[in-house]
Amino acid sequence: MLETISIKDFALIEEKELDFAPGFTVLSGETGAGKSILLGALGLLLGDKADYDKIRQGQEEAELSALFSLHDSTSVKPLLTELNIPFDEELLIRRKINRHNKSKIYLNGVTVGVQELKAVGKELIAVSYTHLRAHETRED
């Protein structure tokens, strides 16, 4: 379960930390409230391709992290063991991206590649998007 996400110098966000309560989480809000930025940061932490243009203007790098509770997460533990990632009941994912198109990824302090991050990310969280479109009808 996602407990906390921290975002620094990503898109418009200088620095923000959000804590999540146990259970189902829904993000909703007005246009421009930051839902897409939050989901973009979460996507990077789960293995999405880095978009280096998302580094906040005037900064050299963005740093993102997420803390997951592994208490009820049985499927990810064997994968972490296979990848030689030490863990107890929590997993800290950190990712740094810089303007030189470099990305550094850490799982509980151990450097990993994007493929390992994607494999772990698939076991941690499900993100569902709902896109609503307004259709304009014209009478001729």
Region spans (language model):
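Gly/Lys-enriched N-terminal cap/neck module of very large, oligomeric protein machines
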Residues: 4-138
